[in-house]
C-alpha cells in the first residue's frame, strides 16, 4: 500500500473509532429498549409533555437534552401519574418524570436522581396582598387541593379556614371571584399558570418561614426523576448530566420558558432531608444564581 493509501486507511480507521466512541454511552447503558430512554410521564405541564417528537416541559426538556448527550433516543410512555412509579419498579420504563418531589418513602422504592429544581410551598394571592408567612394566613380562608400531604399542617394555623378543591383550576376560580383569600397549590403548576395569565393579577410567594413544626409547608423540596434501583449505572450517567446543567445554569434558561424565574427554584435554602438517607452526609446540593 502506498503512502497516500496508508493515510486514507488511517483516516478512515480513526473516523470509525471516533464514531464508535461517540455512540458508546448508548451501548454501555442498560435500558429497557437498547439505544432508547423510555420515559414515563403524565403530560401535566409545566413538568412534562410531548410535542413535535420531543419531550417538552421543564422536566421533559431536561430529559430530552440528557438523552441526546448519552446517545439515546427518547421513547415516550404517556400514562396516568399513578402508573408511573409502578412502571419504573417493574422495569417497563427507564425513568419517570413529572415534578415529583423527593420523599424518604419514595427513596426506598426507587433510585432518585439529583434535584433538577427546588421548591417551597407558598401562597398564590391577588396583587392586593403580599403574604409570605404562616402568620399572614391566620384567620384567612385558604383553598388547596384534596389529598395534598400538608393539609393537616394547614389546619394547625390559628383561625385558618381550609377549603378543599378537586383541581387547581377550581381553586383559582374561587380566588378570582373573591370567595377565598388565597390558594396553597402545587408550586410549579401555580407559577406556570400565573405566568400565562397576566390578566388574573395573581402572584406566588414562597413561604419565608422555615418552621420545623410545619416541615411540609415550609421545608425545602427537591424535584427529582425516579429510576429502578437495579440500574445504578443509568442513574449515575443521568446525574452526571444533571450536574453539567447546573454548572452551566442551563436549568434557569429552561425554567424561564415555563415561568420558573424566582431564586427559590434554583437556590437551595433550608435543610437537606436527603443527607444520610440516599445521599452521603457531606453531600452538597447544586444551585445556580
Stretch-by-stretch model annotation:
Residues 72, 101, 114-159:
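A conserved helix-loop-strand patch within extracytoplasmic ligand-binding domains
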Residues 29-100, 108, 257, 261:
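Extracytoplasmic small-molecule ligand-binding "clamshell" domains
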Residues 42-44, 117-125, 198-239, 264-283:
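Periplasmic-binding protein-like
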Residues 73, 152-165, 202-206, 236-284:
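Ligand-binding clefts/hinges and TM-proximal coupling segments of bilobed small-molecule sensing domains
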Residues 27-52, 130, 135-141, 278-289:
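Immediate post-signal peptide segment of exported/extracytoplasmic ligand-binding proteins
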Residues 75-86, 129, 163-179:
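Short helix-initiation/N-cap motifs at beta->coil->alpha
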Residues 83-86, 98-108, 153-156, 181-219:
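A ligand-binding cleft/hinge motif common to bilobed small-molecule-binding domains
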Residues 60-69, 128, 135-136, 140-141, ...:
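Extended ligand-binding regions for polar small-molecule ligands
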Amino acid at each position: 500500500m502506498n503512502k497516500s493509501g496508508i493515510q486514507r486507511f488511517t483516516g478512515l480507521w480513526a473516523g470509525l473509532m471516533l464514531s464508535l466512541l461517540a455512540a458508546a454511552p448508548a451501548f454501555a447503558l442498560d435500558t429497557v429498549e437498547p439505544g432508547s430512554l423510555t420515559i414515563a410521564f403524565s403530560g401535566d405541564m409545566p413538568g412534562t409533555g410531548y410535542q413535535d417528537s420531543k419531550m417538552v416541559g421543564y422536566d421533559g426538556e431536561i430529559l430530552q437534552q440528557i438523552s441526546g448527550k448519552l446517545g439515546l433516543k427518547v421513547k415516550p410512555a404517556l400514562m396516568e401519574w399513578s402508573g408511573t412509579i409502578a412502571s419504573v419498579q417493574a422495569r417497563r420504563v427507564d425513568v419517570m418524570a413529572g415534578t415529583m418531589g423527593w420523599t424518604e418513602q419514595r427513596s426506598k422504592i426507587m433510585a432518585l436522581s439529583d434535584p433538577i429544581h427546588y421548591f417551597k410551598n407558598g401562597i398564590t394571592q391577588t396583587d392586593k396582598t403580599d403574604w409570605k408567612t404562616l402568620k399572614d394566613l391566620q384567620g384567612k380562608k385558604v383553598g388547596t387541593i384534596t389529598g395534598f400531604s400538608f393539609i393537616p399542617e394547614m389546619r394547625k394555623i390559628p383561625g385558618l379556614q381550609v377549603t378543599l378543591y378537586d383541581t387547581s383550576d377550581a381553586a383559582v376560580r374561587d380566588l378570582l371571584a373573591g370567595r377565598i383569600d388565597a390558594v396553597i397549590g402545587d408550586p410549579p403548576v401555580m407559577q406556570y399558570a400565573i405566568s400565562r395569565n397576566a390578566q388574573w393579577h395573581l402572584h406566588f410567594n414562597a413561604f419565608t418561614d422555615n418552621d420545623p413544626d410545619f416541615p411540609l409547608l415550609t421545608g425545602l423540596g427537591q424535584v427529582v426523576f425516579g429510576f429502578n434501583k437495579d440500574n445504578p449505572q443509568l442513574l449515575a450517567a443521568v446525574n452526571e448530566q444533571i450536574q453539567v446543567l447546573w454548572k452551566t445554569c442551563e436549568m434557569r434558561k429552561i425554567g424561564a420558558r415555563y415561568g420558573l424565574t424566582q431564586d427559590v427554584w434554583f437556590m437551595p435554602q433550608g435543610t437537606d432531608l436527603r443527607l444520610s438517607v440516599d445521599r452521603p452526609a457531606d453531600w452538597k446540593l447544586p444551585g445556580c444564581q
